[in-house]
Regions:
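One face of beta-strands
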Residues: 48-78, 82-88, 93-97, 191-195, ...
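Short, basic/low-complexity N-terminal boundary segments at the transition from targeting/disordered tails
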Residues: 70-73, 136-168
């Protein structure tokens, strides 16, 4: 389960996509190609895309919805440990996080009331800035590292082609492996569309928005909350 563990650490959801067989599906996707070849080509195709969005559940990070560029920049939302949701903006040099009300309340609940009140005022609607390479950002860094996220797929053994299906209206072939189930587009580029693993740390990630522009805007300084300034 090495690959599944790597994916879990990197991320990147039951029912995140609508699946269903229809009578108009092709009868033989990727004729003459083994499941391992189809899966490897799917990983290569997605790695070659300029952008993509991954959404779903990654047990190491909870629910995620992140748009990732080829340069490692990303933006979106992640589930915050301890409660709530974090807005995310990651550039090459910095990571910016902005918590929602639930997250801020969870972070300040054990503070004395006067400190908690001031902290909530300071944090509400503002971004916390950190170095992109900060150890505390390792999980997010792995999620935004598209090559690191996908390259372990090449080492998966025992991949076999399965049934045809559809995901969000797009035809896909099921690739069954000992580590999980993968859905690969059968029309156009053979992009990887979904990854599902089970076990004690299950993940279920859908890949959409492939090659659609992602604009990562850095928050203005006035909207950034600097913890160092608060002692």
């Amino acid at each position: 389960m090495h690959t599944a563990h790597r994916l879990l650490a990197a991320v990147a959801l039951t029912g995140a996509a609508a699946l269903g067989l229809t009578s108009c599906l092709s009868t033989e996707p990727f004729p003459g190609q083994q499941g391992s070849r189809v899966l490897n080509d799917a990983a290569t195709a997605l790695r070659g895309a300029s952008t993509f969005t991954m959404s779903g559940k990654a047990s190491s990070q909870g629910q995620v919805n992140l748009s990732v560029s080829e340069t490692g920049e990303c933006k979106g939302t992640i589930e915050a440990r301890g409660g709530g949701t974090l807005d995310v903006v990651r550039t090459r040099n910095h990571t910016f996080l902005r918590g929602d009300e639930t997250h801020i309340l969870a972070k300040t609940k054990d503070m004395p009331e006067d400190q908690a009140s001031q902290a909530r005022k300071d944090m509400t609607g503002r971004w916390m800035r950190m170095e992109a390479t900060a150890p505390s950002m390792k999980g997010l860094t792995n999620l935004c590292d598209r090559d690191g996220l996908l390259k372990e797929i090449y080492s998966i053994q025992g991949a076999e082609k399965g049934a045809l299906t559809k995901i969000d209206g797009q035809e896909a072939v099921t690739i069954n492996t000992p580590e999980g189930v993968f859905l690969v587009a059968t029309k156009g580029e053979p992009f990887l569309l979904k990854v599902t693993t089970s076990g004690p740390n299950p993940i279920d990630l859908v890949f959409t928005g492939i090659n659609k522009p992602v604009q990562v805007d850095v928050p203005a300084d006035k909207d950034v909350y600097n913890l160092d300034d608060k002692g």
